[in-house]
Amino acid sequence: MTIIQRSTSLNNIINEKLGKIIVASNTLPITVTKFNETPLFGSPLSASRESITSSFGMSEPSRDRESKIQIQINGHPFPTQSALETLKAKDEIEDWLWIGWSHCEVNEDEEPMLNQAIKEFSPHFEHVFLNPRQFENYYKGYCKNGLWLLLHYQMNFIRMQSEWWEEYVGVNQMFAEKIASVWRPSDIIWIHDYHLMLVPQMLRQLLPPEASIGFFFHAPFPSYELFRILPNRKELLKGILSSNLIGFQSFEYVRHFKSSCARLLDLEVHPKGLEIFEDGSTHFTKLQVYPIGVDYNDFAKNLNLPEVSSRVESLRKIFKGKKVVVARDRLDQIEGVPRKLEVFEQLLNDHPEYIGKLVFIQIYEPTVEEGDETDEQKILHKTVNEMVGRINGKFGKLSFNPIEYINKKISYEELSALYKLADIALITPIRDGMNLTSHEYVVCQKDNFGVLILSEFAGAARCLGGSIIVNPFSKKEIMEAIIEALNMSMHDRKLKHQINYNYVLANTSSFWGKRFLCDLNEATQKEIMETSVPRANFQEIEDSYKKAKVRVFFLDYDGTLTPLVRLPSQAMPSKQLIDVLSKLTEDRRNEVYVISGRDRSSLEKWLGHLPIGMSCEHGVFTRQPGENQPWTESPNAEVQWKDTVLSIMQDFEDRTPGSMTETKQVNITWHYRNADPDFGQFQAKELIAQLRSVANKYPLDILSGKKAIEVKPIGINKGEIVKMILQKIDADFILCIGDDKTDEDMFKALYNVPSFTIRVCGDLEESTKARGVVESSSEVLTLLNRLSLS
């Protein structure tokens, strides 16, 4: 079978050249070492079995003799770095700068020396200095012993201390200030992962509002029930939500993130993102899925190196006549290495025919230097060592061990050789954002068609459809998958491999980076109000107002004159609103109408002392402008249906915690703003379905508003009230403002009438008949106050 190669053209995404990309990540993609010292992380440890490892090493280090600093590029490039280098080479970005921590332990006096050495090594890297206290509290404490464990569902190991959080805030502020110091108006800021969740919000306080800020979340995002455990959960969400775009590895993580934001911050959730109201303005954060990839070309070139080919041949001689299973994991709890070893032991117990014919190469890379491990890591390391020794003692011989255990960081070239050799890759983390080892294995298996066994809890399981997917908690499933892979026909191996290979080839790190950056650029330009409807032109409205002799205002109440609140009774008018309405009514050329879904008693209580016109319950009752004007009732206000509808709504109120039923003189409304967001939305759909059966018997309208379902007599709506009023007034200035679907009836009534119609914010996915938009009720007050002073 021929493997079909598919190329992905980045130019098909967006042809526009982007500005400089400022990447902010906890770690720089380089290894920095003080002369004659080892780095905090990254130095190779000795191999446990020299028979199958060789030292290709990393790139030749750069050493500053005066500063005694040694710097070298990591042998295995980060996907983000690969993406930036490729995009720069293709002239698709102006340049790039990476801001991060070197993991090199220096004192404050040596910091200038370190910064200078890094600048001389490459202009693409900018160092953020962490002192030992920050390293302990921010990195080892809050990030690794708190956030990282929670994001990966490791609840038994989580620890939290207040000083850890304080240091986390401080380090995030350091990163924000460093970014702000190098930022220029055309730059695009790209922040990475859970270490820096507060940085976007901090940057909003340091940079102009038009700054383009994107955030990519590499780790899994947990369910709401887990995330809510964090003491500072709201601060973290608010921090990251100041981004224009947030990217995740899979839709599952987007769903969890939306759920946490809706429940903890009471935010409006849309299919494409989240709507945030803060300080009188609105911001929209787009959420999208961007599965990360690997640099295919880099791996392909590496496979053709003479030393890699030579190493593959030597390994084949060592393991001649044997099937090879490879696994590469970090020294941490989420990788599930002890369970894999238990599976392998059970396999050899149950199937002795594989003894001597099957070898398991377990690469176990340390994530910290010896002595810096946590107690859990030390126990884990000891457990794995003991298990490997026991299994090899049980099933091995002098000339052969069933498990080859490599407990060190190995070179890029050595990895490539092992990946190319292996017949099976066993990748079974308990939880992982993506796990690019799977992609790397697929690239290296271009000619061998090895089988990939993959945990269903790795993000890669949603991308690599040719894999055998297993539950990493089921030893039986894993063992059956290994046996299936060992006995798979070449035809099936090729079919499965081609599915994976085509995906990896099409979804490279460059494609991932380009997609994210182009979407970020677009999201920044558009924001929530950058739709087909332009922003309302206040100057044009004011100019028309000044020229007019007869002016009419049609104003919604909730969400328009006042901000939306959790309880209807809390939506009392502000003093500023009362003052503005009073000023407008002092001019005899003005007639002001508040047209609301509110009940009559509330409007009378809050606004009844003003000489304004009012219509309540969406047009059921109307009062003309002036003092002591009587209310008139619509002739269509029949209420025979009311008991039936009330009974249904009260039943849903009983079955939906946090919801409430509001009974007006005619209309009835079921509110679910205080209910669980997902369950409330589900119940709202169910309620509408039941109410439609009632509407078949009675002439009723069912209105779906913002977190509310209202039932009213048919033929009564805000648009009909507007038409009725305009029949009596020959106005040469009309201003109509509303914020939800019920106000669309007013906009429709005025669509062919010379007028100014404005929608306050609204649903991104919802079209409007309004001719302009504003972001919030505070902007409405600004406009009305401006007109009252004209």
Swiss-Prot record:
Superkingdom of this protein's organism: Eukaryota
Membrane spanning residue stretches: none
Enzyme Commission number(s) of this protein: 2.4.1.15
SUPFAM superfamilies: HAD-like, UDP-Glycosyltransferase/glycogen phosphorylase
Gene Ontology biological-process entries: trehalose biosynthetic process
GO molecular function: alpha,alpha-trehalose-phosphate synthase (UDP-forming) activity
Disulphide bridges, residue numbers: none
Keyword Heme: no
Catalytic activity: D-glucose 6-phosphate + UDP-alpha-D-glucose = alpha,alpha-trehalose 6-phosphate + UDP + H(+)
UniProt keyword list: Carbohydrate metabolism, Glycosyltransferase, Transferase
CDD domains: GT20_TPS (cd03788), HAD_TPP (cd01627)
Keyword Ligase: no
One Pfam family of this chain: Glyco_transf_20
Chain's role: Synthesizes trehalose 6-phosphate, the precursor for the production of trehalose, the main carbohydrate storage reserve of the dormant spore. Trehalose accumulates in both prestalk and prespore cells and then is rapidly metabolized during terminal differentiation of stalk cells, while being stored in spores, where it serves as the principal energy and carbon source for germination.
Family according to the record: In the N-terminal section; belongs to the glycosyltransferase 20 family. In the C-terminal section; belongs to the trehalose phosphatase family.
Name assigned to this protein: Alpha,alpha-trehalose-phosphate synthase [UDP-forming] B
Organism: Dictyostelium discoideum (Social amoeba)
Taxonomic lineage of the native organism: Eukaryota, Amoebozoa, Evosea, Eumycetozoa, Dictyostelia
